[in-house]
From Swiss-Prot:
Keyword Iron assigned: no
GO MF terms held by the record: G protein-coupled receptor activity
UniProt name for this protein: G-protein coupled receptor 42
Residue ranges annotated as Cytoplasmic topological domain: 41-47, 112-132, 200-222, 280-346
Compositional bias (Basic and acidic residues): 307-330
CDD domains hit by this protein: 7tmA_FFAR2_FFAR3
Encoding gene, per UniProt annotation: GPR42
């Protein structure tokens, strides 16, 4: 794309992009940190296969959130990359890898949930923890291998122009780069989005049907929340983003609206904690207990701070009263001395 040196490839409002990144960071980071504490505690006390998958999903979200400040700096700089160039492909690789990791782990969780309900006896006899660990490794490798195209694109062809014509990061591409990137994006949309979506839809539709026939109302509500949060992730956060892959492949260039649907995909780190919450009653109980402890610590800290503040005010009042006491004492002493002199004269 031919643009002048002072023009930006991005014609939208970069502060809107910054605001979405900031909101995602402020909301997603504390929620995922709380989820991390809960999952670590659960795995130490009563390890379950689905918690291994959800712990990896939490780690993926936290990795995205930790690298999100780089994107915030880029957005605040008008979508130009002001940081060292080596951070550009790294942040892009982490960003896109974690997005597709969410889709893969959500599909794996749906399989676990379906098997635990549809085949409970067989499910209990299987060594699920080891298999969950292998599935997690496979998901990380599959997503990382596909998203390594970021490095291929950034360092392909003319290295001097690999960082975009205007100092942008993974926004502008030459024709030879698009010839590699667009087919890979299409393949990623099929393998890392459509296939997990089909698997997840099948597993949860069967799960809802089975529980609708004989499950408790409480469990039905929990599964309904899990399905709603999962479908929200797939259809709202990831759907438009992967549609941009298909449109880009057909049109032969990246759609101009791609940046906005990419923002939707980052919001998955705020939606995932709801998936965790509805994943099991055990997580809900542990989460409520953790919140209760945090609220107790907060109340204790406020009480101690209030007592310290009162003590400080009391000390200041005492120091303020001391000069007045001295003046009163000096005045009374002066009057006593004068009286004695008068008596002596008489």
């Amino acid at each position: 794309m031919d643009t002048g040196p002072d023009q930006s490839y991005f014609s939208g409002n970069h502060w809107f992009v910054f605001s979405v990144y900031l909101l995602t960071f402020l909301v997603g980071l504390p929620l995922n940190l709380l989820a991390l504490v809960v999952f670590v505690g659960k795995l130490r006390c009563r390890p379950v296969a689905v918690d291994v998958l959800l712990l990896n999903l939490t780690a993926s979200d936290l990795l995205l959130l930790l690298f999100l400040p780089f994107r915030m700096v880029e957005a605040a700089n008008g979508m130009h990359w002001p940081l060292p160039f080596i951070l550009c492909p790294l942040s892009g690789f982490i960003f896109f890898t974690t997005i597709y990791l969410t889709a893969l782990f959500l599909a794996a969780v749906s399989i676990e949930r379906f098997l635990s309900v549809a085949h409970p006896l067989w499910y209990k006899t299987r060594p699920r923890l080891g298999q969950a660990g292998l599935v997690s490794v496979a998901c990380w490798l599959l997503a990382s291998a596909h998203c390594s195209v970021v490095y291929v694109i950034e360092f392909s062809g003319d290295i001097s122009h690999s960082q975009g014509t205007n100092g942008t990061c993974y926004l502008e591409f030459r024709k030879d780069q698009l010839a590699i990137l667009l087919p890979v994006r299409l393949e990623m949309a099929v393998v890392l989005f459509v296939v997990p979506l089909i698997i997840t839809s099948y597993c949860y539709s069967r799960l809802v049907w089975i529980l609708g026939r004989g499950g408790s109302h409480r469990r039905q509500r929990r599964v309904a929340g899990l399905v709603a949060a999962t479908l929200l992730n797939f259809l709202v956060c990831f759907g438009p983003y992967n549609v941009s892959h298909v449109v880009g492949y057909i049109c032969g260039e990246s759609p101009v609206w791609r940046i906005y649907v990419t923002l939707l995909s980052t919001l998955n780190s705020c939606v995932d904690p709801f998936v965790y919450y509805f994943s099991s009653s055990g997580f809900q109980a542990d989460f409520h207990e953790l919140l209760r402890r945090l609220c107790g610590l907060w109340g204790q800290w406020q009480q101690e701070s209030s007592m310290e503040l009162k003590e400080q005010k009391g000390g200041e009042e005492q120091r303020a009263d001391r000069p007045a006491e001295r003046k009163t004492s000096e005045h009374s002493q002066g009057c006593g001395t004068g009286g004695q002199v008068a008596c002596a004269e008489n």
